[in-house]
Amino acid sequence: MRSFIKSHRKSNSLESDSDIDFKQLKRKNASTSQLSPPRYNTDYYDPVTSSPKTPTHSHTTSDSLPQKHSPGFESLHRLFNNKLFKKASNSSLNSYLANTDSQSRRSSKDQDPLAPSFHVLKTSSNPASQDSELPVIKGVITHTWGNHSKHNDPHVIVLNDPKTSFETLRSSDLEPPPRLTSKTTRSSVSSERSWSTRDHSMSPPLTSINQDIDIPEDMATRSKNTLINKKKMENRQARIHSNDDLIAMRKNSSDTLPQTAEFFASDKLPGDSTPILEIPESPPPVITLEKYNSSLSDAKELSRSKNVRSNRTSVVSMTQSEESRWSNHLMVNSNHNQNKLRDSDDSDYSNAIDEEDDDDADDDDEASQFSFEYSNLSGRTPSVKYYSKPEPKQMVYIDDLYDDEDFDEDMNYYDENEVSEFLQEEMASNKNNINTDTSVLKDLSSPSINDHSNEKPIYKPTIQMRVNKPKVHRYNDLFALSDEDDPSFNDDDEFDEDEEEGGDDNDEEDEIDEEYDQKVSDECGQSIELQSDDIHSDYGVEYYNDFGGDLNLQNDVQKHHINKEQQYISDEEFDDAITDFNMAKHIIEEEVVLDKAEALRYQKDAEPVQSKTSEDVVNYVDEDSNLRINEKLEKGDVTYQKPTLLTEVKNKQFQKKPVASFADIFNLESDSEEDINNEDGLTGLSDVGLDEDDAVSSPILQSPFESQSLAEGLVSPVICTPGKPNIINKQIIPTIKCEPSSPQEKTIENNKSHTASNFKEYGLNHPLPPPARSQALKFHDLNSELDSELPALMSNLYFIDETEEDAYNELNDVTRDEDEYLDEINTVPEDFNFSDTENDNNAAKRMLRRSNKGSFRSTYSFTDKPQGVTTESSPIKNKLEVNNKTVTFFSSPGWSKSPGSEIGMQRSKSPVKPSSGYRPFGQGSKQFPITPSHEPNYSIEEDRIASTDEILESRTPPTTYMAPSPAFIPNYSLSPIQEASSSVTNSPKR
């Protein structure tokens, strides 16, 4: 009841307001009709606003009726089912319909049109009609429909048009309002004008001030139904445009910019419900080029200042001064140059706006995307916003580094190029120290007769000595460094301290060094630069003779012939310097290598040196061998040959061959074999003409210090004698007996016969050894995470083609044990015949039915009519009972089935070896032959013979299962293999 009272009061207030508004409208219409003749229908405006309603399908009348409409008033009719105001509303509406119809017919004859595209009707000024109450439709600011353009431009819907708050809209522009009752006919108070308030932007420009436009009579008498249908078609083709679209349409449309700008002008006063169109009495002034440019720049600044995104629903408005400019510009016929300039500026501005829109669109596309989740029940579910994921970064695997870089066993990096360069530099420096001059050899071999023996040898640290300082080749070497050892910190500081503290001492030392170098260079041809004690004593052996062996030269003799008055170093350093001097002598001796045949000739004079223990004990011979070498060097029978690097020999001798087939794997050596060869110094002996039996190894390679010195990169050079066989001096270079490091070959025995292969020397052509399981890799042996789990290089893994492997096995008669077993226990054998159980005798089946009838009924099967007696609840003992176990049925091997025999197969509980010969199967049964299955050799020929006698053979070993026995004839199916005894929790009875 409260809602009824409120709505009734609201409707009364609406009626009172409509009476006041209509009286004001009558006074204004009367005054305007008396003042001016009916020329412009724009003088007449409706004081009410309306909103578009749902279109109706009734076309009974040519006019539409505005009715009292408010939310409360309409809700009352819906609430009380048209019982409250039915009589009053019908009487008032019916009385009003007759008046409005007659008035509209009279006024249609006296109308004056404004434009050919508008059909305008004047309102009659009859006092009787003016005194009658007119129902009012109240509304809010609504959207206005655009006019149909002659140039087929898209229809425009202006959002929240400010004109609608002050101007009234015609009902013809909108859809006819719905009738309040089902019996009333539709009419409209605002039918006096049908197309008067079209958009000014779409109307043609006014060419003159007081020009009357005549319209044909057929347009005046056009029926309302045609207009409504046309309006419907236009509304269906309409589109809602934003502020950006309207700006772009203004620039691209054929209409001028001032025409569309007038459409957005909203400078009407709020209290004035009837805006007055001011018509200038004098001709408008001509707009100059400067004035036009200023107005255009103002418009650009105004439009650019607006935010495009935040003002999607706003309407571009112009100031009053700008509107006056554009309205004046409508009356001006500007020259052709001004039009061109205006078009060019407009096109540039529109292009700039389009580019901004495109950039915004691109940003929106790249920012995010939307997708929808679809469910089975309710179709599309709420949308899910997801962002574009960046491309994943390329992963770096360890094997990629292995291909290009070098790592040792401890994953420490080392570069072979740096090591080889270091060795080459050391080799070049030591090569310069070696001189074939006999005087030098005599001086080194017999220091007692040396002219310069009385002088103290002084060893100065040179640049090469600094190279010998420990370099960082491994990751662990970083922790061995310190600020004292680092040359970058230590050398400069010490040099500065020495200059500050004792500059005189340094000058004296430099003078002594220069004198010593001059004397040695004059006598030997080149200066011998040795390594000082302070470098090699802390970091181990640097030269390859620093192994601490007996040098056969007494240090006391050296000390006796040296003048100690010139000593400026301590006794310990002096002793170490003498040791280094003796090592320099053996540099030349150990570089000279003679041929093997000549070595046997000199072997009579000296005792051959061999290793008698497991450790490589090196013993040196007397000094007579040194004299023999000196004699050959004096005669010129011996020429020096450049020593070769170990790295070069490694690349030639132990270069990994590419694996092209399955057989190439067995030609490769393991890493341990290569390490043994490298440690024993046997690498590259074939290049110098030596065998492994007489392997020559330098003692520098078996140094207990395990130094990575220059000697590890050198192979003893060969001294060639012209016209004589090469000579090896075993008195100087000791020999070490060692066994060949290659693994011995193993013979391959066949099932029937196989000839044992003889042992051959390493490196010769020999048949390939049998494949080892550790070397033969298959695809299923490879793990998916090899990059992080394998410690060795990826190049050691080879993907073997199984066809090549099979061909190799057939060629070498290599049997594969895995072929004799099933691949999987749950796989049915390939030779299994599924029709074996169907060919059994019918008598066995009938016996099965008779014996299992009672137990079959106990498994809750109602094939027969149940009896009222107690039955056993447990199944028969031959029933299959499993508990999550998988059972494979297959025919047992080692027995034959003759035609017409009635046999079954029993479940094997334990593997029993059947004996050869015949075995009886129960009472009255026949005897069947059993294939001997305990023989050690299981050949293929026996299988072929057995197949002719219908012997059922499987791929499993025949010693696994026992021969069948017909003890349980009802169990005629194949024998099951059960993994273990299980309970009956999951038995078939449940």
Curated annotation (Swiss-Prot):
Residues 49-64, 180-194 have a biased composition (Low complexity). The lineage of its organism: Eukaryota, Fungi, Dikarya, Ascomycota, Saccharomycotina. Disulfide bonds: none annotated. The keyword Cytoplasm applies. It is found in: Cytoplasm; Bud; Bud neck; Bud tip. Residues 122-132, 308-321, 924-936, 972-990 have a biased composition (Polar residues). Residues 345-366, 482-516 have a biased composition (Acidic residues). One of its GO terms (cellular component) is cellular bud tip. Residues 103-112 have a biased composition (Basic and acidic residues). Its main location: cytoplasm. Residues 1-11 have a biased composition (Basic residues). Keywords: Cytoplasm, Zinc. This is Zinc-regulated protein 8. It comes from the Eukaryota. Involved in maintenance of polarized growth and daughter-cell-specific transcription. Belongs to the ZRG8 family. Residues 1-73, 97-134, 168-211, 297-366, 480-520, 856-876, 893-937, 955-990 are annotated as: Disordered.
